[in-house]
Amino acid sequence: MPFSADSVTSLRQLADALAARSVSAEELARTYLARIEQAGALNAFTHVDAERTLAQAREADARRARGEATLLTGVPVAHKDVFVTRGWRATAGSKMLANYESPFDATVVERMAAAGMVTLGKTNMDEFAMGSSNENSFFGAVRNPWDTDRVPGGSSGGSAAAVAAGLAPAATGTDTGGSIRQPSSFSGITGIKPTYGRVSRYGMIAFASSLDQGGPMAHTAEDCALLLNAMAGFDAKDSTSIPPEQGGVDEDFARYLGQPRAGASESQPLAGLRIGLPREYFGKGLSPDVEETVRAALRQYEQLGATLVEVSLPKTELSIPVYYVIAPAEASSNLSRFDGVRYGHRAAEYRDLLDMYKKSRAEGFGAEVKRRIMVGTYVLSHGYYDAYYLQAQKIRRIIADDFQRAFAQCDVIMGPVAPTVAWKLGEKTSDPVQMYLADIFTLSTSLAGLPGMSVPCGFGDGNMPVGLQLIGNYFDEARLLQTAHAFQQATDWHLRRPAKA
């Protein structure tokens, strides 16, 4: 039977087809480039360079012919436009960097290229990763492939939409407060935010340095494991990268996939697994359709042998104010470098250097970015640092401790990714607080630096996807992926595709 990309459901299938020479990397790249062109209305990509992509694909084919291929050689991937890429624009979704081209590759891009993966293009995103709906991009809003009148989630909305619509088999994303998990949930794909420090931030345009973390977005847990194998590892160029002596060792994140837990059977591969359900994740604010879908997924886990245990994360409601003090404070510092002098947007007319700074930043940044810079500058200012920033950091420590108390009672924590399914475009843009509340279940994981993922588990109102959130303890990605994979072996939610894909 001739190869057809339409029948592909995982990266493993693509890798096997490439290894068997059923399809070449160049043929595969041409297929996905054609899809990207046809689906331009989704606005998932900010930059596509077909010739550059095809050159990479031809090199992947040559590498395979020389017998130097890795498992992922020739497999296409899209990169969130927050990762700098030599020869491609790196805009962070902002007018400030609309025409910026980096002289070097981000470590994540470099490592995936070293594995032989082929870059399809750069995906749209909320400006400087500040947003939950991908409506804050200078390049326009991204549309959800399941319902093009709805948001795909943010800030990695372009990556989520691209994977969901079949425009790319996989994509990179970043997660500062939920920006891999929430769009994965809204778009019906699988995504994982690793432990903070697992994946290098070198070459990742910074929003909040103590929170930002890169990770993969794809269709299956196995896909994410294979991608994480390529992405993760210590990087001396990133001061926040975890060195081997502190746990940042290279490992095979796919090593437990398909294996029952110790002492478990094939029919109940998760026997002995204790799943913690935070009571704060199932209360006021959670829409009934999402709760029903998530609880159905939890019943499936019980059938796989797991036991459900109630736990408490008492500071969950404080995660929003804590995050929106710490993240804007760090953004205020990080974004001070964008002034139009060495790179980035520069105002056309100005009186002097100070006027040029002011006008360039006023013209280059969008409304949400300006709002967060102002909030961050305020909380760091004299007289307010102790009252806001220092207090927020203290509560952040308490939030991390709460997770450790919960993990004393369970092996993995589960719950909804978001309180609702994806909302309509424009529905929350006039109310920033309502937009921020959409991240209530993802922020605390980021504040604690824990690994978390979203796994498709059904559909809610409007036949829109719902994601189940899995949270593991530090460095527990392999077990987290094993737990997600077992669910996907027993269900087919991850195989569902939007009608137009």
UniProtKB/Swiss-Prot annotation:
Recorded hits in SUPFAM superfamilies, A to Z, give:
Amidase signature (AS) enzymes
Keyword Transit peptide listed? The answer is no
Report which reactions are catalysed by this protein.
L-glutamyl-tRNA(Gln) + L-glutamine + ATP + H2O = L-glutaminyl-tRNA(Gln) + L-glutamate + ADP + phosphate + H(+)
Record keyword Ligase present: yes
PANTHER family attached here? GLUTAMYL-TRNA(GLN) AMIDOTRANSFERASE SUBUNIT A, TRANSAMIDASE
Its quaternary organisation is: Heterotrimer of A, B and C subunits.
Name of this chain's protein: Glutamyl-tRNA(Gln) amidotransferase subunit A
From which source organism is this entry? Answer: Cupriavidus pinatubonensis (strain JMP 134 / LMG 1197) (Cupriavidus necator (strain JMP 134))
